[in-house]
Amino acid sequence: MMRIALFLATNFAVMIVLGIILSVTGIAGNSTGGILIMSVLFGFAGSLISLFMSKTMALKSVGAEIITEPRNNAERWLVETVKRQSQQAGIPMPDVAIYHSADVNAFATGATKSNSLVAVSTGLLNTMTEDEAEAVVAHEVAHIANGDMVTMTLLQGVLNTFVIFLSRMIATAVSSSRNDDGEETQSSGTYFLVSMVLEILFGVLATIIAMWFSRYREFRADAGSAQLVGKEKMIAALQRLQRVHDPEELPGSLNAMMINGKAKEFFMSHPPLEKRIEALRNL
């Protein structure tokens, strides 16, 4: 959840800034070709910046420390576990970090498999059994082995491109008119307003698609963990999470918007725990 939230937040912020620049300056012009080229460039810029900043941002956001020399048995176990599992998965050893938090959480991030990170909270190490923690770490290693951050970046880049392109094509059509001399003119104020509103609306639809893909990745990472440590350990870890907290709970802002019930699942980066457990049992 942490890596997805950071990725999408950064991507969205960059998209908004670049979108305003495009609208105010009119860089893309009115031609379909010009709008398409700028949509691709700016669409992928947001996701690529998010990708290459992901590791640094994740570390700073939770105050995590990369373990260079284990200071206790817990850190030693964590480093050895990540090393063993990364060898099993056939990927370079990721950086291993730990951060102080009561939350039972872990995440993996990084631009490439050779420049990746696995971070675990002290709350997870203190709450879960060794087998359960091992399964969670394997889940994060599987994310790296599957190249999930890169695939999410490519998907987000494509979605961004469509959001920018469609919003500006529609805005161009809505804001264009002909004067008394038959010359085509465009209202810059209308263009800016329409393009920004459409970008937000299309952005919501793009988020739903991105979250669907994120949930699919979680099922794959669960299966990857099962291959590394056995599905019973992963099931036990998910059952522990069920007892500890409700990972399906959404931020209050979404509840305030009356996004609840079945609709909530469209905006969740992770599938409901019961569905993940059922999928593991069916392996």
Curated annotation (Swiss-Prot):
GO biological process, one term: proteolysis
Cofactor mode of binding and number, as noted: Binds 1 zinc ion per subunit.
Upper lineage: Bacteria, Pseudomonadati, Pseudomonadota, Gammaproteobacteria, Pasteurellales
CDD domains in the cross-refs: M48B_HtpX_like
Cross-referenced Pfam families: Peptidase_M48
Any one cellular-component term (Gene Ontology): plasma membrane
Subcellular location(s) per record: Cell inner membrane
Active site as annotated: 140
Chain ranges passing through the membrane: 4-24, 33-53, 147-167, 192-212
Name of protein: Protease HtpX
Top-level taxon of origin: Bacteria
Membrane topology: Multi-pass membrane protein
